[in-house]
Amino acid sequence: MTTFRELGLSDSLLQSVESMGFEEATPIQAETIPHALQGKDIIGQAQTGTGKTAAFGLPLLDKVDTHKESVQGIVIAPTRELAIQVGEELYKIGKHKRVRILPIYGGQDINRQIRALKKHPHIIVGTPGRILDHINRKTLRLQNVETVVLDEADEMLNMGFIEDIEAILTDVPETHQTLLFSATMPDPIRRIAERFMTEPQHIKVKAKEVTMPNIQQFYLEVQEKKKFDVLTRLLDIQSPELAIVFGRTKRRVDELSEALNLRGYAAEGIHGDLTQAKRMSVLRKFKEGSIEVLVATDVAARGLDISGVTHVYNFDIPQDPESYVHRIGRTGRAGKKGIAMLFVTPRESGQLKNIERTTKRKMDRMDAPTLDEALEGQQRLIAEKLQSTIENENLAYYKRIAEEMLEENDSVTVVAAALKMMTKEPDTTPIALTSEPPVVARGGGSKKRGGNGGGYRDGNRNRSRDGRGGDGRNRDRNRDGRNRDGNRDRNREGSRDGNRGRRGEGQGRPGSSNGRGERKHHSRKPQA
C-alpha cells in the first residue's frame, strides 16, 4: 500500500490527513494524486466509497495559493447533498492550510451566497445550475480558476446538466486542469472529455474493487403486496444498527416511512421535495442514531457519507444497475462489513440479471422470513443481550430477588418469562402501500431510459400536462429559465425522484453537442 507521505503532498495537507486518522491511500488516491499534482488532466472511474473525494481534493487543495483572494478551483456535483458532503470533506482536509471552501447550491438563500462570495473563497463546490446562476449574475468570476473537478459526471448527465456544465467550462480560463470522475463513461461524457481535456490520464478502479467485496448481497423473491411485511420481519431478525431503505419514488418514501413508524420503528424519509433544512435535520438525527431507519430515493441519498450504516434494503429494485451499485455503497465502508438486501418481484428477474452482470457477482438467494421466524429472531437477539449482560455487568444487586424467584420456579421458566418480557412482538398492524409498477428489463440487456418511460408499463407515469417530464425541468419555471424564487438550480432531483423517465446513456440535451460559446480552450481538440 502507498502512504500519503509518499505522494508528494504539502506538510499542511499531510497534517490534516493524519489528524483525520488516514495513513494509507486507497487505490484511486494512490493512482490519481501523483498525476494530478503534475498538472495532468484526469479521468477517474470509481464508485462512491473508494475515497475519490480525497483523490481529487488533495491535489486541488495543494495547488491553492492562500495569499490570493480569488476563486482558484471549482468542484461541480450533481446534488446539493453531494456538494455539502464534498465541501465538508475539503474543509477538513484544507483546515491546516486555511483554505476557504464555499458550497453553493439550490434551495439556499442566494443573497446569503452572494455575501459569502464577497469574502473571497478559494474553492467553490456547487451544483451546475446554481454555479451558472452566479456566473450570469456576475457574482462569481472564474478568471483565476486553475482546476475544475466534475464529480459523478454520469449522474449529472442523467439529470440533464450537460448543457450547464459546458457553459461553465467555456467560462474558465483556457489554461486549466480538469479532473473528471464518473462511474461509467457514456458517449456524452466522452465528448466532454474530448472537447475540454488535454491527453487525460485514464484511471480506473478494478472491477473487484468496484463491486465492494465487504458487502454481503442477497435477493428475495417477493410479491409486491408482501414486501412491507417481509421488510419489517427482516428488521426484527437482523436488528440493524443503522439501515437505509431505498424506494423508487417520493410517494413510496413518504408511505414507507409513515408505515414503519406505525409498526414501531424509528424511521424518517428523505427525497427531493423536502426543504434543505428538513433534509439536514433528518440526516443529523440519522447520524446521531435517534432514528434507526432512513428511507430514501436514489437522488436524495446520492453522495451521503454516513459511517456505521450496517444494512441497505432495496425495497424497490432500482431502474438501472449503476444505481444499485451506488445504493449498496452506503454500507461496507472503511473496511467494515455490510449487508445489502434486494427485493425482486416475479416480473423483475431480468433486471436482477442485469444487476448481476454489472456487478460481476452472483447474489445469494434468501427465503422471505415467516412471522414465526421473525419472532424467533427477536428472541435470539434478546438471548444474546442477556448473555452479554451476564458476562459484562455487575449483577450482585439483582441476585437476591433472582434466588427468591428460583425457589418458587424452575430456572427455564424464569428465563422464558424474561425473554417474553423483553421480546418485541412482531407488529401486524395492517399497512396499505400504493403499488409501484415492476421494472421490467427489455431485450435482455441493460435497460435504457428515455421516451419509453424508464420501464414503467404505462410509459412516463408522472408527466406534466404539457408533455414534459423526465428531463428534470420544473414546470414552475418562467420564461427566463428561473423558477418563482429566482432559483435557477431547477429542482431536477425532485422530478427525478418521482419521474425516472430520464434520457438514456448516449443522449444529452438537444443541441448540447455544440455547447455554448465558441471560445477555444487549451484542451479543445480541432474539429474534423
UniProtKB/Swiss-Prot annotation:
It catalyses: ATP + H2O = ADP + phosphate + H(+). The keyword RNA-binding applies. Pfam families: DEAD, DeaD_dimer, Helicase_C. Its EC number is 3.6.4.13. Keywords: ATP-binding, Cytoplasm, Helicase, Hydrolase, Nucleotide-binding, RNA-binding, Stress response. Residues 33-203 form the Helicase ATP-binding domain. GO terms for biological process: response to cold; RNA catabolic process. Its main location: cytoplasm. It is found in: Cytoplasm. Residues 518-528 have a biased composition (Basic residues). GO terms for cellular component: bacterial nucleoid; cytosol; ribosome. ATP binds at A46, Q47, T48, G49, T50, G51, K52, T53. The keyword Transport does not apply. A motif (Q motif) lies at residues 2-30. SMART domains: DEXDc (SM00487), HELICc (SM00490). Residues 214-374 form the Helicase C-terminal domain. Residues 458-506 have a biased composition (Basic and acidic residues). Belongs to the DEAD box helicase family. CshA subfamily. Oligomerizes, may be a member of the RNA degradosome. DEAD-box RNA helicase possibly involved in RNA degradation. Unwinds dsRNA in both 5'- and 3'-directions, has RNA-dependent ATPase activity. This is DEAD-box ATP-dependent RNA helicase CshA.
